[in-house]
């Protein structure tokens, strides 16, 4: 989704009194809560699932960019600390969010290799264990079937 905002004059905003300033969360508090810490670790099951997903991309000769690898790793480490993961559908929640936000949007191509990539990812990311990613993958598969086999995250 692309959000378009109307331009505003910054001067109009500067003189506004901020209500409830004492209730605002500081940037330092946000960093303490959501930035990776030395003691953050990725749960073994989440790491194994991530390794399996990376292997699917490697087997199809499709690269995941190093920057995205690092973002997924850090997101999963913090997510394993912060997220509730006590049901089968939420056990892999950090990876489910990271995959659907950082990796799946990079899929953009057509042909048998991409069809097999989506099929293999759907086997690994099921509606029971990674519902967000599974939903996106199913949508990509369905749209590609009606779009000459072109697989793209942002297709509608």
Report the location of each language-model feature:
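C-terminal regulatory/interaction module of P-loop NTP-utilizing enzymes
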Residues: 1-156
């Amino acid at each position: 989704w692309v959000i378009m905002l109307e331009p505003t004059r910054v001067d109009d905003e500067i003189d506004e009194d901020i209500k409830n300033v004492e209730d605002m969360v500081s940037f330092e508090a946000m960093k303490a809560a959501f930035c990776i810490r030395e003691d953050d670790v990725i749960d073994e099951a989440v790491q194994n699932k991530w390794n399996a997903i990376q292997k699917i991309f490697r087997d199809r000769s499709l690269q995941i960019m190093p920057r995205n690898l690092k973002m997924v790793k850090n997101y999963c480490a913090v997510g394993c600390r912060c997220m509730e993961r006590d049901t089968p559908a939420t056990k892999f929640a950090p990876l489910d969010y990271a995959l659907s936000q950082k990796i799946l949007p990079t899929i953009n191509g057509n042909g048998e290799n991409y069809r097999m990539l989506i099929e293999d990812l759907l086997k690994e990311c099921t509606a029971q264990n990674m519902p967000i990613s599974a939903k996106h993958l199913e949508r990509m598969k369905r749209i590609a079937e009606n779009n000459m086999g072109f697989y793209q995250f942002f297709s509608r």
